From Swiss-Prot:
Protein name: Conotoxin Vi6.1
Disulphide-bonded residues: C49-C62, C56-C67, C61-C77
Subcellular location: Secreted
InterPro entries: Conotoxin
GO CC terms: extracellular region
Entry keyword Disulfide bond: yes
Organism this protein belongs to: Conus virgo (Virgin cone)
Tissue note: Expressed by the venom duct.
Pfam families: Conotoxin
Domain comment in the entry: The presence of a 'disulfide through disulfide knot' structurally defines this protein as a knottin. The cysteine framework is VI/VII (C-C-CC-C-C).
GO molecular function terms listed in the Swiss-Prot or TrEMBL record: ion channel inhibitor activity; toxin activity
Propeptide: 23-47
Residues where 4-hydroxyproline is found: P60, P63
The organism's taxonomic lineage, starting at the top: Eukaryota, Metazoa, Spiralia, Lophotrochozoa, Mollusca
Stretch forming the signal peptide: 1-22
Length: 79
């Protein structure tokens, strides 16, 4: 009798933990390598253009930004 109760409680606990874990990971990607690949693709150093507030002396500004303040130190990408 005690063993049956322990087994029932264990099954209920494992079922509840599976449901909680499934709900938590619903919007996350399954494979860590895919997430890392996306992070490397969006890495700041991998872009070919300067973002807002970055210098435009050595690289062009990203689309939608303009190089402003082209003094002696070069300009800054701004809207």
């Amino acid at each position: 009798m005690k063993l049956t109760c322990v087994l029932i409680i264990t099954v209920l606990f494992l079922t509840a933990s599976q449901l909680i874990t499934a709900d938590y990971s619903r919007d996350q990607r399954q494979y860590r390598a895919v997430r890392l690949g996306d992070e490397m693709r969006n890495f700041k150093g991998a872009r070919d253009c300067g973002g807002q507030g970055e210098g435009c002396y050595t690289q062009p500004c990203c689309p939608g930004l303009r190089c402003r303040g082209g003094g002696t130190g070069g300009g800054v990408c701004q809207l």
